C-alpha cells in the first residue's frame, strides 16, 4: 500500500510502499479517509539524531500521521461492536490498559508506552495514518457513526489536546473570572470554542497575528490582544489589575511562559500544552502564591468521545484545508510557512 514515512531523523518524509497490515483478533483494519497534519510532524522531521524529545526516545522509520479518521474495512474475530463501513476516529495515544495510569483513566501517561517526555503514538514511534490502511486495537477507536471522517480528523489531536488542556478550567471556572489563551493556532482556536461552550469565564486571546485575533473574536473570545512587550499592561487594564485566573499557553516559549506566570492570580492555574521548549523561573515573587503550573500532555479516549459529541451537535467550527495524498509535501511546506487558513487535512482517494 502507498504510505508516507519518516525514514530518518533530520529528513523530510518520503513516499514508500508498505505492507498492508493484517488485523489480529482484537484489532480493526481501517481504510483511511483523512489525516490531519500537525506541527509536531515537522518537529520530528527536523529532529537531529539523539535530540530531545523525539530522537532521543524513539527510533525513526515509521509512517507519519497522528490525526486519523476512516471507515472500518475489516474486524478481528473478537470485535463485535463495530460494523464494516462505520466511520471511526483513532485516539492516537498508545496505552497498555493495565498500568496504574491506564487503570486511572489517564492513558496518555501509560508507563509502557511513555518514552522520556513523550507518549508513543500512532505517527510517533508507531505507524500512523498517512497510508491507505491502518490497523489499531479496538480500544483505540471512537465510533462517529455515519459522520464525515474528513471533518473529524483534526479533532483527534488539535481538537482533543486543546480540550484536555482546559479540563481543569472547565471544572473550576466561575462567572467573572478571566482565562487567557496564548496562541490562536490550530489548538488555541479550539480552546477558545471549548471555553466559550463550557464555561462562563471571560476569555482573553493573545497572538502575534491580527488575523488570528480576529478569528478568536469570531469564535467567542471577549478580548483579543497582540502578544508583545505590552501584553501584561493590556491584561492588567482589562482585568483592572486583578490578573487572570487561568492561562492556557499553546506556544510554550520563554516569552509566553513569562507572560503566563506574570499575570496569573493567587490560586490560579497555568496549563502548558505548547512545546517550543521555553523555560521560566518559578519561586517566591516570581509567580503568584498557590498558583498551579501544569505541562499538559495529550488526552484520553473519553476526552475524544466528548469532543466528537460536541461536533455531532454542530457546536464546533471546524476549518480544514484539503490536500490529496500526492500533495503531502506541499501541505507540510504550507504548514511550515504559516500559509494555511485551517487545519491541513490529507484526503485519501
Predicted features along the sequence, with ranges:
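Residues in the short beta-alpha loop(s) of Rossmann-like NAD(P)-binding domains
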Residues: 209, 276, 299
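Rossmann-fold dehydrogenase core element
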Residues: 269-271, 281-320
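Glycine-rich beta-strand-centered segment in the early N-terminal region that forms part
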Residues: 21-35, 50-103, 145-147
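Cysteine-cluster motifs in flexible loop/terminal segments that predominantly coordinate metals
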Residues: 91-142
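Glycine-rich cofactor phosphate-binding loops and adjacent beta1-alpha1 units
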Residues: 170-175, 198, 214-294
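Mid-domain Rossmann-like dinucleotide-binding core that forms the NAD(H)/NADP(H) cofactor-binding site
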Residues: 139-141, 145-229
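Local beta-strand N-terminus motif with an aromatic residue
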Residues: 85, 176, 221, 243-244, ...
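C-terminal hydrophobic helical "lid"/dimerization subdomain
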Residues: 258-262, 304-349
Amino acid at each position: 500500500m502507498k504510505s508516507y514515512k519518516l525514514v530518518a531523523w533530520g529528513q523530510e518524509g518520503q513516499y514508500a510502499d508498505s505492507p498492508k497490515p493484517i488485523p489480529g483478533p482484537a484489532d480493526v483494519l481501517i481504510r483511511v479517509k483523512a489525516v490531519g497534519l500537525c506541527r509536531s510532524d515537522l518537529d520530528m522531521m527536523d529532529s537531529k539524531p539523539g535530540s530531545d524529545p523525539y530522537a532521543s526516545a524513539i527510533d525513526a522509520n515509521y509512517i507519519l500521521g497522528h490525526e486519523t479518521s476512516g471507515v472500518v474495512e475489516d474486524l478481528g474475530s473478537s470485535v463485535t461492536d463495530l460494523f464494516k463501513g462505520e466511520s471511526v476516529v483513532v485516539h492516537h495515544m498508545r496505552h497498555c490498559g493495565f498500568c496504574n495510569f491506564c487503570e486511572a483513566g489517564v492513558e496518555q501517561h501509560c508507563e509502557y508506552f511513555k518514552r522520556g517526555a513523550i507518549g508513543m503514538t500512532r505517527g510517533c514511534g508507531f505507524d500512523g495514518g498517512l497510508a491507505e490502511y491502518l490497523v489499531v486495537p479496538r480500544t483505540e477507536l471512537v465510533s462517529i457513526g455515519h459522520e464525515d471522517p474528513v471533518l473529524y480528523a483534526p479533532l483527534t489531536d488539535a481538537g482533543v489536546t486543546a480540550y484536555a488542556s482546559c479540563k481543569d478550567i472547565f471544572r473550576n471556572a466561575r462567572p467573572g473570572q478571566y482565562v487567557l489563551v496564548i496562541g490562536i493556532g490550530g489548538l488555541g482556536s479550539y480552546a477558545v470554542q471549548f471555553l466559550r461552550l463550557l464555561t462562563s469565564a471571560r476569555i482573553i486571546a493573545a497572538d502575534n497575528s491580527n488575523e488570528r485575533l480576529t478569528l478568536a473574536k469570531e469564535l467567542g473570545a471577549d478580548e483579543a490582544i497582540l502578544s508583545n512587550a505590552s501584553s501584561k499592561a493590556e491584561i492588567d487594564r482589562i482585568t483592572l489589575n486583578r490578573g487572570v485566573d487561568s492561562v492556557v499557553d499553546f506556544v510554550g516559549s520563554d516569552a509566553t511562559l513569562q507572560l503566563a506566570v506574570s499575570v496569573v492570580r493567587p490560586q490560579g492555574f497555568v496549563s502548558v500544552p505548547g512545546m517550543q521548549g521555553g523555560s521560566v523561573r518559578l519561586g517566591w515573587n516570581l509567580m503568584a502564591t498557590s498558583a498551579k503550573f501544569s505541562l499538559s500532555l495529550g488526552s484520553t479516549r473519553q476526552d475524544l468521545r466528548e469532543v466528537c459529541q460536541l461536533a455531532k451537535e454542530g457546536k464546533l467550527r471546524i476549518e480544514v484545508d484539503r490536500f490529496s495524498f500526492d500533495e503531502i509535501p506541499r501541505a507540510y511546506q504550507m504548514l511550515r510557512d504559516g500559509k494555511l487558513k485551517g487545519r491541513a487535512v490529507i484526503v485519501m482517494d
